[in-house]
Amino acid sequence: MWKLKIAEGNKNDPYLYSTNNFVGRQTWEFDPDYVASPGELEEVEQVRRQFWDNRYQVKPSGDLLWRMQFLREKNFRQTIPQVKVGDDEAVTYEAATTTLRRAVHFFSALQASDGHWPAENSGPLFFLPPLVMCVYITGHLDTVFPAEHRKEILRYIYCHQNEDGGWGLHIEGHSTMFCTTLSYICMRILGEGPDGGVNNACARGRKWILDHGSVTAIPSWGKTWLSILGVYEWIGSNPMPPEFWILPSFLPMHPAKMWCYCRMVYMPMSYLYGKRFVGPITPLILQLREELYGQPYNEINWRKTRRVCAKEDIYYPHPLIQDLLWDSLYVLTEPLLTRWPFNKLREKALQTTMKHIHYEDENSRYITIGCVEKVLCMLVCWVEDPNGDYFRKHLARIPDYIWVAEDGMKMQSFGSQEWDTGFSIQALLDSDLTHEIGPTLMKGHDFIKKSQVKDNPSGDFKSMYRHISKGSWTFSDQDHGWQVSDCTAEGLKCCLIFSTMPEEIVGKKIKPERLYDSVNVLLSLQRKNGGLSAWEPAGAQEWLELLNPTEFFADIVIEHEYVECTSSAIQALVLFKKLYPGHRKKEIDNFITNAVRYLEDTQMPDGSWYGNWGVCFTYGSWFALGGLAAAGKTYYNCAAVRKAVEFLLKSQMDDGGWGESYLSCPKKVYVPLEGNRSNLVHTGWALMGLIHSEQAERDPTPLHRAAKLLINSQMEDGDFPQQEISGVFMKNCMLHYAAYRNIYPLWALAEYRRRVPLPSLGT
C-alpha cells in the first residue's frame, strides 16, 4: 500500500540532511506489510479505474491517494449538509456560509502534520524519463525503482498516452517527438518489449515516432539525453561548450546574466557535452538503436541531423543568428578545444563547471533548483566519481521528487509546499471561521515560520552567480534554498496577518527582524521599470533571448519581470507599511509607486494581463487587480481597473463562470475552453478580481452568478471536482497544481461572503 510520509528523514542514511528537520518534506513509500482492508483496496482500485476510463476527458489527476489516506487517518466525515441554489433562487448568506464551512472543514482535514498542504505539482512528460534513464545508466534502477515503483511509472505513461499513440510535452498537449521518444525509451528500460504495454503502448508509440521522421527529429534536449544514453551521437548535437563558465564576466552572454534555470540546466549539460559522456552500451541500447530510426544506425549522417526538429515540437523557431553561432562553434571552436594544447582550456572549464555544480548541490541539500537540473547534476556527480559521496547525497534526495496518484507515479517539478500553503492560509483566514479552525491556522503559521530561509547561500555567493536569499521563502521548503519573490511576498503577508491575531489562537508572531529580511529581498528584485523578477534581479539585455537554445520554450535565457510577482509584492509591502510605518518608508513608497506603474504599463489592449504562471489572462488579471486595489487604485480613479473589469465581465460564461484554455498561454491571446465550459479555479480567480474592483457596489449580479456556480459545484464531501490544468511555465508547458481546485473556490467564496452584501433567510 502506498503511503505519503511527512517531514521524515532517515537516521540510517548519512547522506541525507536538513536545515530544519525536514519540515515540508513529502515522500511516498510502498509498505508491503501494511494490511489494508478490502474497502481500502477497492477504493484505490476504483479511483484508478475512474481515471483510466475518463483519461481523455480530464487529464490531470484528482491527486486522490494521499487525500483518501489523510481523511481515513483523521476519520473525517462531512457532517454539514450540502446546499444547492436553484436557477430562480438568490444566493443567501446562509447558503454561502454553509458551502464555505463545508469547504473549510474538508480542506483543513487535508493539512499535513507539519502544517503544510501536500499536493501534486507535475504535468510535463519530460520530467520522469530522464530520471529513469539516469538510474539505468548508473546501475541503480532496481534499488531506486523496485517492482511496485515500476508498475506505477508504467501506469502513468499508459494513462497519458494520446489517442494518436504519442505523448505530449505535458499531459494536455498534442503529441511531440521529444516526449514520445522519452516515454518509449522509459517503457523499454522498465521491462516492456518492443510491442508491449497496455493498449499496445510501445508499438503505437514507435509508429508515431517513425511516422514523424524518426528520432533524428527530436529537439535539442532530446538529442542531449539520447547521446548520453547511447542511442544518438554527440556529433549530431549543437555545441554546449563548458568554456562559457570561464568567460570574462563583462561579456553579455556570461552565465551570471542568464536566468537561473537556464544556467542550472546548461551547467551540467555542458559538462556532459565537454566530456562527450556516453553510458554503457547494453543489449537494450543496441535494440533501441534499431527500433527508433527509419534507417540503419551506422548509416545516419549525424551532422545533418543537428538542426532537424519535428514541427510538432517547435514553439520557438531558432533565428538565423543563433544557427550561425552554433555553426561557428561546431565548425571552428569545438575541433580546437578537443586537441592539444587547447584541450587544457577545456579541462579547466570542466573543473570550473564542476565546482559550480557542487556549490549548487550543497546549497540546496542536493535537491537542486528543479527536477530537470536534479537528474543532470546527479549524473554528473556519478560521472565524476561513481562511488563518491556527492552521488550518494543525490540518491538520498530522489524521493523528494516522486509523487503517486491514481494515474501512477510521476516526477514533481520539485514541490509547491510553501506556495500552496501561503494561499491556503490566506483563503482560510478570509473565511472568518477562525474560531472553528484555530489548530489548523496555528500549524500553518508554524510551517510558514519554520520554512523561511534564514541565511544567504554559503561563502562568496556572488562569485557563484547567486543572489541574497536570507529572509525569503522558496516555492517548496527551506532545504531547497532558492528565494522566489512571490513566494516571499505571500509568506510575508501570512506572517503579517498572523501578527495581528491573538497568539493563543495562531501561535507566537515572527520576529520583526525576519520580516525586515523579507522586505529586503523584495526591494532587491525590482527593476527600473517597476516590475519584479522572480528569482534574481533582471537586467540582462533582451536580445540575448535570440540565443534561446530550446525549441519548445520561450523567454528562458534571461530573468524577466512578472505581473504576478509585482502584484504579490505590492500587497505584502502595503500591509507591511501599515504595521511597520517607520521601516524603509521612502524606499517602500517608491517601490509601490513604480510597481503600480509597471502593472498599468503592461496591461493588454483588451484590459487583461498575461499570466506567466497560470492560465492565463484570467490569472494575470486577478493578480494585477489585487495589487492595484492594495495600492488604492479603484474603478473610479484608475483606467486600468475599469478596462480589466470590462475584460472579465465580457469573458464571463452563460453559467456564471469563467473558463480559459491553456492555449491562451502559448498563443498569447485569450482562448475560451472548448464548448465554452467553465472552470471552477478560473471562476475563483475572476470572482476575486471583480471583488477587488468593488464590483459589488456597481452591479453584484455577475458576482452572484459566479458564486452560485461554485456553490452548486461543490461535491458531497466538501471537495470540488478536478478539471483542466491551471498552471504554466515558459509560455508553452503546463503544470498541474492539484491543490488549486480547493484553494480558489474556497477563497473566492470567502471573499464573496465577506465583501458582497447578501440577503439572509432571517430577514
Swiss-Prot record:
Organism of this sequence: Panax ginseng
Tissues where the protein occurs: Mostly expressed in roots, and, to a lower extent, in stems and leaves.
Ranges: PFTB repeats: 100-142, 150-191, 441-485, 515-560, 592-632, 641-682, 703-744
Function: Component of the oleanane-type triterpene saponins biosynthetic pathway. Oxidosqualene cyclase converting oxidosqualene into beta-amyrin, generating five rings and eight asymmetric centers in a single transformation.
A GO biological process held by the record: response to nitric oxide
A GO term, aspect molecular function: beta-amyrin synthase activity
Domain of life: Eukaryota
Entry keyword annotation includes Protein biosynthesis: no
Protein name: Beta-amyrin synthase 1
